[in-house]
């Protein structure tokens, strides 16, 4: 990787004295704790060859390097993974380079996190391991959306178990919030959520996945372009908080900028607790008690019982109608973008001519199905993103066909004439996307959010944890979230995993990219670079990016669309394997949106 920036390699060991046994804290989760208990199995755990890349003046075009992986020329494509696996030495598992050949791929909104995820896959980790490590790294490098104070949702495909499911760990509202609380806060869920994910689907030691994030916080990291972009509009307000100013202001008291060096000692100490004692330390026991007091001191509201009892939930995914034997799985409400995406996908599957459509017709059909989905959302979605109606009913064949009434290839239907008229609602653009695929053909796609950029704008004193805003107030919440995975249940093959952010445009951008690849046969890189359009129905206007061609715009206008330009429509992170994984790993591409400052690594 040659980006013209300094790279620093840190090797460190974790003292046996820190390897405390896991107590009752994890038992409060009611789930298996063997992944955390593995921390105690070695008296001296060496986490080696972890690379921390310092990004200085990282150009957009430089944030998408292709990592060349060694190929096994003597193996056929079908047998290569099995042959490689037989050559792996379990004694080296956990060390970078353990996996020879195809390792999978990762995508993250912040480059340091993606590089750590890549190292995890190289060390023999699963997609769940990689996403877990990327999340905790992001809690240090992208706290605007990924602080330990927030929550999220993931969709998981396990190739071995032939199973797809969703994990809901969205940040919850405390019960009975007293009047007069200055800045009400949601209950933190990320630590428990990713522990539950890794407990079920991970393979590496818990401590090994947390240690890179802990080091980033303790030894410091440079502000990436991704974080600088999040800080720019609200940095001045953020540093009014004394605790936040200690981290995010420079020697002159001004917000830090790209390239500035920051250390987060309090957050490092919190991550040490999570690494050595498991995530339960944040929810039960002495540290949890201090955390509750710190949240309340920061103007929030949290109780010991509320913190202890907040648990992630495994849920069924929202499944689309089939297209060419493939099913698209989306996160369920309260990640309401999942139903919006599943309905859009299902209407395109019923339409069944997306692959033969020209660019004008593709943009038109994407707009028509989107505004119908948003119109339907106005009927079923609560302000928190939860559904008044069973999600299965919302994606049933009968309901999808009813949504398609009046839809035409040749003419735009006025949003006001739909059976469910779309309603304009505010939605926070603040969220973060993480995607990983491993060498076994398993995949994980996740969104995490603080329900507002930097949550409440307060840090719980002494913990380094930025606190999440309450969901459901003034558009703050998971309404636009909806990570997805496309797979074939008959052949048990993986084809696409993705997650998106940037508010109301997130589900339309994600389906746009996925449909172009899976239904339209477009090359993955071309699909994510393709100029986008968006139609939310309120107002009845089709928005387009500046690089949409004049011929397409002319065609859309001729179909009755009112069009308006915007600078960018959604940010998508995705991994696509057009010919299926694990059979054809050579077709896989990891893709970071060129509209963002993240990084895609591997999957080549």
Set out the residue ranges of the language-model regions.
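Residue-level detector of structural "landmarks"
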Residues: 1, 25-30, 34
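Bacterial N-terminal signal peptides that target proteins for export
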Residues: 50-73
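C-terminal motif of bacterial Sec signal peptides marking the signal peptidase cleavage site
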Residues: 82-83
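Noncatalytic scaffold domains of N-terminal-nucleophile
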Residues: 86-115, 119, 125-284, 289-326, ...
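Active-site rim segments in enzyme catalytic domains, especially the processed small/beta chain
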Residues: 128, 140-146, 153-157, 165, ...
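Short, small/polar residue-rich loop motifs at catalytic or cofactor-binding pockets
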Residues: 315, 428-431, 453, 479-481
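Internal maturation/activation junctions in enzymes
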Residues: 350-449
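Extended C-terminal subregions enriched in glycine
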Residues: 510, 519-567
């Amino acid at each position: 990787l040659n980006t013209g920036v300094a790279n620093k390699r840190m090797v460190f060991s974790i003292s046996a004295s820190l390897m405390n046994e896991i107590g009752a804290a994890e038992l409060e989760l009611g789930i298996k704790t063997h992944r955390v208990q593995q921390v105690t199995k070695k008296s001296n755990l060496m986490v080696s060859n972890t690379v921390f890349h310092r990004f200085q003046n990282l150009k957009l075009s430089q944030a998408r390097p292709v990592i060349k992986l060694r190929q096994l020329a003597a193996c056929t494509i079908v047998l290569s993974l099995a042959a490689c696996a037989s050559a792996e030495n379990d004694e080296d598992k956990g060390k970078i380079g353990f996996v020879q050949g195809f390792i999978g791929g990762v995508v993250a909104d912040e480059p340091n996190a993606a590089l750590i995820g890549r190292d995890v896959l190289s060390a023999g980790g699963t997609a769940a391991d990689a996403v877990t490590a990327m999340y905790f790294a992001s809690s240090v490098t992208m706290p605007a959306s990924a602080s330990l104070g927030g929550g999220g949702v993931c969709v998981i495909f396990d190739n071995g178990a032939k199973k797809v499911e969703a994990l809901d760990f969205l940040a919850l509202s405390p019960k009975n919030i007293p009047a007069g609380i200055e800045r009400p806060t949601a209950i933190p869920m990320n630590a428990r959520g990713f522990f539950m994910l890794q407990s079920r689907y991970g393979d590496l030691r818990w401590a090994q996945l947390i240690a890179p994030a802990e080091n980033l916080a303790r030894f410091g990291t440079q502000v990436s372009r991704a974080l600088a972009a999040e800080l720019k509009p609200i940095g001045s307000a953020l540093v009014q908080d004394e605790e936040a100013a200690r981290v995010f202001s420079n020697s002159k008291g001004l917000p830090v900028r790209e390239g500035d060096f920051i250390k987060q000692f309090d957050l490092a100490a919190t991550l040490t607790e999570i690494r050595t004692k498991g995530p339960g330390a944040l929810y039960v026991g002495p540290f949890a008690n201090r955390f509750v007091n710190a949240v309340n001191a920061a103007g929030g509201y949290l109780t010991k019982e509320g913190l202890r009892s907040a648990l992630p939930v495994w849920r069924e995914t929202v499944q689309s109608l089939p297209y060419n034997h493939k099913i698209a799985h989306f996160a369920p409400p309260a990640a309401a973008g999942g139903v919006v995406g599943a309905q859009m996908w299902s209407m395109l599957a019923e339409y069944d001519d997306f692959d033969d459509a020209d660019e004008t017709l593709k943009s038109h059909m994407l707009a028509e199905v989107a505004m119908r989905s948003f119109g339907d959302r106005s009927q079923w979605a609560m302000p928190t993103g939860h559904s008044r109606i069973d999600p299965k009913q919302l994606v049933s064949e009968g309901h999808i066909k009813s949504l398609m009434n009046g839809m035409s290839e040749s003419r735009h239907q006025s949003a006001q004439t739909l059976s469910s008229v779309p309603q304009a609602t505010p939605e926070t653009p603040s969220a973060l996307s993480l995607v990983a695929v491993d060498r076994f053909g398993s995949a994980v796609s996740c969104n995490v959010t603080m329900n507002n950029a930097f949550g409440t704008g307060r840090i719980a004193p002494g913990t380094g944890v930025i606190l999440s805003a309450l969901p459901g107030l003034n558009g703050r919440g998971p309404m636009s979230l909806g990570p997805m995975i496309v797979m074939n249940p008959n052949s048990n093959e993986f084809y696409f995993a993705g997650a998106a952010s940037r508010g109301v445009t997130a589900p339309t951008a994600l389906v746009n990219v996925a449909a172009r690849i899976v239904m339209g046969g477009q090359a993955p890189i071309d699909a994510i670079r393709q100029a986008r359009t968006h139609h939310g129905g309120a107002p009845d206007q089709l928005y387009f990016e500046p690089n949409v061609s004049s011929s397409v715009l002319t065609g859309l206008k001729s179909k009755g669309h009112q069009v308006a330009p915007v600078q960018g429509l959604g940010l998508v992170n995705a991994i696509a394997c057009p010919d299926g994984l694990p059979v054809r790993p050579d077709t896989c591409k990891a893709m970071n949106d060129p509209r963002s400052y993240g990084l895609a690594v591997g999957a080549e």
